[in-house]
Amino acid sequence: MKLKNGFVLRKMPGMNLVLPAGENIKTYKGALMLNDTAAFIYELLQEGLDSAVIRVRMLDEYDVTPEKAEEGINKTFALLVEGGVAEE
């Protein structure tokens, strides 16, 4: 999973938004709203980490089973691809 260039994560009280930046402002309309877990995964993707490392970090950060962590990662990846801010 790789994030596309031209998007930024903005954290505000109660919400996390992925917004277009630079040239993307002209073509990408709207914003992608993420929950706190998805924002955590997005930040790890910004660091260039792969899904295996993200899974380990999820297990360290949250009290979830490995299966639940994997499910959350897969859902977030799908959301980011659907939203046009990432590619597989």
Annotated model-derived regions:
Residues 30-88:
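Long, charge-rich, low-complexity alpha-helical segments
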Residues 1-46:
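Acidic, low-complexity/disordered tracts enriched in E/D and polar residues
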